[in-house]
């Protein structure tokens, strides 16, 4: 494992992912989420940040086993969409929607699914580009 790339990609994941989540949930779509009444009145920002630390450590670690080092952008995009968009999104959207009361389940499903897909694509591409092509590929 290339420790420098791992740490850099993880740090980038944490910072970029947290910024996307913060802006998405607490700025751009704040009124939508407020109207859904699915979140606590005061979000606990520290828990969100800790979540991104854990996600980043795992996402980047597992990415190293997935990548082939030939097409970093494409490999990162696919990995991000599958791991973040589908797997994490499945839990974050479907399971949360099933467990919590909301004023509009369809709005929740659309907005939160879009968040996971877009975030997964951005983070996957970014990590793929940080790792880049493998030598000789």
Enumerate the language-model features and the residues they cover.
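Juxtamembrane/disordered regions of integral membrane proteins
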Residues: 1-137
């Amino acid at each position: 494992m290339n420790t420098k790339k791992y740490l850099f990609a993880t740090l980038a994941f944490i910072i970029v992912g947290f910024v996307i989540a913060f802006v998405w949930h607490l700025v751009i779509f704040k009124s939508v989420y407020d109207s859904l009444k699915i979140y606590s009145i005061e979000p606990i920002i520290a828990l969100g940040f800790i979540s991104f630390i854990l996600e980043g450590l795992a996402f980047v670690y597992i990415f190293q086993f997935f990548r082939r080092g030939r097409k970093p952008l494409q490999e990162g995009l696919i990995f991000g969409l599958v791991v973040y968009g589908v797997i994490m999104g499945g839990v974050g959207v479907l399971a949360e929607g099933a467990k919590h009361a909301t004023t509009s389940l369809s709005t929740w499903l659309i907005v939160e699914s879009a968040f996971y897909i877009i975030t997964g694509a951005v983070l996957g591409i970014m990590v793929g580009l940080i790792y880049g092509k493998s030598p000789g590929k």
